[in-house]
Amino acid sequence: MKKILLIASMTAGLTACASSPAPEEDSRLKEAYSACINTAQGSPEKIEACQSVLNVLKKERRHQQFANEESVRVLDYQQCIQATRTGNDQAVKADCDKVWQEIRSHNNVQ
């Protein structure tokens, strides 16, 4: 009986050790994305580079929803910037600023 309890406790301990690096890595990816967004300062080229981190996050099941939502926001922002280059700068700039603030607010490093 003691052997069974010992084996069960060792298995539980090893399982806990084996699964702890994954959440740590996940949080590092989200932190990397947040840092990328925070340093992008609205630059479409820099934001495009952040997309590669989102692509990795999309592969992680627990981050798929976040990554998909952020991808939409980033694409919205890039389209918005493109619209300012081709159309009425002033009218579109306010919309771009709103989208950018939304991206920033979702990516504040806590």
From Swiss-Prot:
It holds the Pfam family YbfN. It is a lipid-anchor. It is found in: Cell membrane. InterPro entries: YbfN-like (IPR025727). Disulfide bonds: none annotated. Induction: In the absence of chitobiose, expression of chiPQ is silenced by the ChiX small regulatory RNA (sRNA), which sequesters the ribosome binding site of the chiPQ mRNA by an antisense mechanism. In the presence of chitosugars, the chbBCARFG chitobiose operon is induced and acts as an RNA trap to degrade the constitutively expressed ChiX, leading to the translation of chiPQ. Chitobiose and chitotriose also induce chiP mRNA synthesis. A lipid is attached at C17 (S-diacylglycerol cysteine). Keywords: Cell membrane, Lipoprotein, Membrane, Palmitate, Signal. Residues 1-16 form the signal peptide. This is Uncharacterized lipoprotein ChiQ. It comes from Salmonella typhimurium (strain LT2 / SGSC1412 / ATCC 700720). The lineage of its organism: Bacteria, Pseudomonadati, Pseudomonadota, Gammaproteobacteria, Enterobacterales.
